[in-house]
């Protein structure tokens, strides 16, 4: 599966700061020092509907991570998956009378278009769950043969009790885990499981649903968590720098994935930092496909909204915060974009040297994009009020905003 085209990232003078990021597993900020190649895995979409602003907010956060690392002169090995076979996708296809593969391909193509328009840097590897199945089967077999997985009526489950580190990612107690498991695709009430929290690794073939050759596992399809583990281990290995996604993935998805990988390799941790973006709401509820309370990126683009304004709207909220999408949020972003473009359109202006460092410092401090925007606002206000004589300043500001915030002025 191919990703989307990359926009050019301008080189800035000097060197960026090392990233200090909030780690869900420890509950505090840690400073990451990835070495010459930073490694990041971000969980991708389940392609049964268009990209909404909640999706965009998540991918914006991890785009900032890439840009901070690139500014430190590192290479970035970024991997993202597509969950192109899953119950919600199959259910939507049946509801709408569509072929599930055509639905997945169409929505994945639209996602690529949205990411291109928003100038999100693409992953080096963009991998669908279906194409990963040949690598998933032997991992499930290894877990079963090692006693970390068991058969239940033809389905294969992972035994969470075999991982001594289970629970470290989310920090939740057993009851909270059980409640969230039931809400987020688990089956804690299924009789016969060793632990109610045990997640499915391999689902035996069901009538009317797609299935694949699972060798000794039998015909079926993989569970959600093992898909990401297989892709991450194949392309990044253990101990990569950031496992990223929305905050609703901390449990069960990232918790279970870490346990799968740790049981497979005997190594810990799966990732050095677990980084989670907040939820975007609409009308008082989390924006989600299941609720149908969605604002689509593609719809806003068709209505003529500049993608750069959408990007600024996302950047106006800290990535870890939960926030509401409103017309006012968008209006403020449109107005900010106009101010910035007017400021950099002049032939000269106030010195921008301090601005570059302020934006760098803000983003290195747990991706504080609101502080970065405020720094650019101050320069634009000074330009509007007093102007300046530095002929290179508007260009420096434009390149800084492009390189570090992904906004083309």
Curated annotation (Swiss-Prot):
Keywords linked to the UniProt accession: ATP-binding, Ligase, Metal-binding, Nucleotide-binding, Zinc
InterPro entries: Cys-tRNA/MSH_ligase, Mycothiol_ligase_MshC, Rossmann-like_a/b/a_fold, tRNA-synt_1_cat_dom
Motif ('KMSKS' region): 286-290
Biological process (GO), any one: cysteinyl-tRNA aminoacylation
GO molecular-function terms, A-Z: ATP binding; cysteine-glucosaminylinositol ligase activity; cysteine-tRNA ligase activity; zinc ion binding
Motif 'HIGH' region: positions: 45-55
Principal EC category: ligase
Catalytically driven reaction(s): 1D-myo-inositol 2-amino-2-deoxy-alpha-D-glucopyranoside + L-cysteine + ATP = 1D-myo-inositol 2-(L-cysteinylamino)-2-deoxy-alpha-D-glucopyranoside + AMP + diphosphate + H(+)
Record's keyword annotation contains Repeat: no
Keyword Chaperone: no
Function according to Swiss-Prot or TrEMBL: Catalyzes the ATP-dependent condensation of GlcN-Ins and L-cysteine to form L-Cys-GlcN-Ins.
PANTHER family in UniProt: CYSTEINE--TRNA LIGASE, CYTOPLASMIC, CYSTEINYL-TRNA SYNTHETASE
Family per record: Belongs to the class-I aminoacyl-tRNA synthetase family. MshC subfamily.
Subunit-level organization: Monomer.
Protein name (database record): L-cysteine:1D-myo-inositol 2-amino-2-deoxy-alpha-D-glucopyranoside ligase
Organism: Streptomyces griseus subsp. griseus (strain JCM 4626 / CBS 651.72 / NBRC 13350 / KCC S-0626 / ISP 5235)
